[in-house]
Curated annotation (Swiss-Prot):
Protein task: Actins are highly conserved proteins that are involved in various types of cell motility and are ubiquitously expressed in all eukaryotic cells.
Transmembrane portions of the chain: none
Cellular component GO terms, alphabetical: cytoplasm; cytoskeleton
GO-annotated molecular function: ATP binding; hydrolase activity
Protein name: Actin
Family that this chain belongs to: Belongs to the actin family.
Alphabetically ordered keywords of this record: ATP-binding, Cytoplasm, Cytoskeleton, Hydrolase, Nucleotide-binding
One Pfam family from the record: Actin
Length: 375
């Protein structure tokens, strides 16, 4: 493989797709992982309506489209739509010919075996990639933070995982998954705003609520205390202007929404909160490495971007951990993109170049080669 050809790094999240070139410090393209199809028959002939739209274009025409997310809970469930997203990534966003660049894709922890095979097959057969590799998202986030040991709490739009990693290897028996992430918090905010009399029903209006969530929500250090403060004064209230000019006011919803991460029972889910899940994950690991994990709890993903989340996590885990244990929460400012950044670092390492699956190897062994080469 010649030096000058940059590898492509694509982090396919449930909510957003992050794509760019290895060696860059940030992704070139970040767009929603959505495919939209027209809800109505086009009436104006020659308008050039397409039968499907991807990413930002689907987002901007959302009023007339039905939006679908091909990745649910971090795992690809609709391969035809996924192919459209990859096609869009190569040809419209990065403007590259995929047959000229090695491709590094990311996958969710505990991704089913046949899924990695399918990804491998599509990259080699549909897009003719010269070389390919697939890497676990949480491991890449840890690389991006400059560590090889730690526990990653990765929470995006579709799924949350706690992944303990020791010397660069994830420990599958201790990985825990919670199907509670950004999308569920958006749904929950829709619900609690409804109690205030604000109705958001269409998929387009839910995107507005997502924006409200990202701009105004935060995690309370002490939830009960914060509720009292909110009830007694209006200092926590903020206003938000809707696209039609109407202004809405939001108060305790600001911290009630992300509180569901710590108390999933608010959503009617019988799951442990992110703090308890992180602790449970650590407890599934060998006694000897727990100290290293407590001292390196790394946050990653868009749903860890709330103000106050690291302090709250510190407080909750310190309460669960043995009293003498040093607990350290690492929350890098670029954690929204740390999976992608880790991929960019990995794919540009000189030692990594012999790790790629070459097209010739694929042609010889078929899709199952991915299990031998990528672990």
């Amino acid at each position: 493989m010649e030096e000058e050809v940059a590898a492509l790094v694509i982090d396919n999240g449930s909510g957003m797709c992050k794509a760019g070139f290895a060696g860059d410090d940030a992704p070139r393209a970040v767009f929603p992982s959505i495919v939209g199809r027209p809800r109505h028959q086009g009436v104006m002939v020659g308008m050039g309506q397409k039968d499907s739209y991807v990413g930002d274009e689907a987002q901007s025409k959302r009023g007339i489209l039905t939006l679908k997310y091909p990745i649910e809970h971090g795992i690809v469930t609709n391969w035809d739509d996924m192919e459209k997203i990859w096609h869009h990534t190569f040809y419209n966003e990065l403007r590259v010919a995929p047959e000229e660049h090695p491709v590094l894709l990311t996958e969710a922890p505990l991704n089913p075996k046949q899924n990695r095979e399918k990804m491998t097959q599509i990259m080699f057969e549909t897009f003719n990639a010269p070389a390919f590799y697939v890497s676990i998202q949480a491991v890449l986030s840890l690389y991006a933070s400059g560590r090889t040991t730690g526990i990653v709490l990765d929470s995006g739009d579709g799924v949350t995982h706690t992944v303990p990693i020791y010397e660069g290897f994830s420990l599958p028996h201790a990985i825990l998954r919670i199907d509670l992430a950004g999308r569920d918090l958006t749904d929950y905010l829709v619900k609690i705003l409804m109690e205030r009399g604000y109705l958001f029903t269409t998929s387009a209006e839910r995107e507005i609520v997502r924006d409200i969530k990202e701009k105004l929500c935060y995690v309370a250090l002490d939830f009960e205390q914060e509720l009292q403060t909110a009830a007694q004064s209006s200092q926590l209230e903020k206003s938000y202007e809707l696209p039609d000019g109407q202004v809405i006011t939001i108060g305790n919803e600001r911290f009630r929404c992300p509180e569901a991460l710590f108390q999933p029972s608010l959503l009617g889910l019988e799951a442990a909160g992110i703090h308890e899940t992180t602790y449970n994950s650590i407890m599934k690991c060998d006694l000897d490495i727990r100290k290293d994990l407590y001292g390196n709890i790394v946050m990653s993903g868009g749903t860890t971007m709330y103000n106050g989340i690291a302090d709250r996590m510190q407080k909750e885990i310190t309460a669960l951990a043995p009293s003498s244990m040093k607990v350290k929460i690492v929350s890098p400012p670029e954690r929204k993109y740390s999976v992608w950044i880790g991929g960019s670092i990995l794919a540009s390492l000189s030692t990594f170049q012999q790790m790629w699956i070459a097209k010739s190897e694929y042609d010889e062994s078929g899709p199952s080669i991915v299990h031998r080469k990528c672990f």
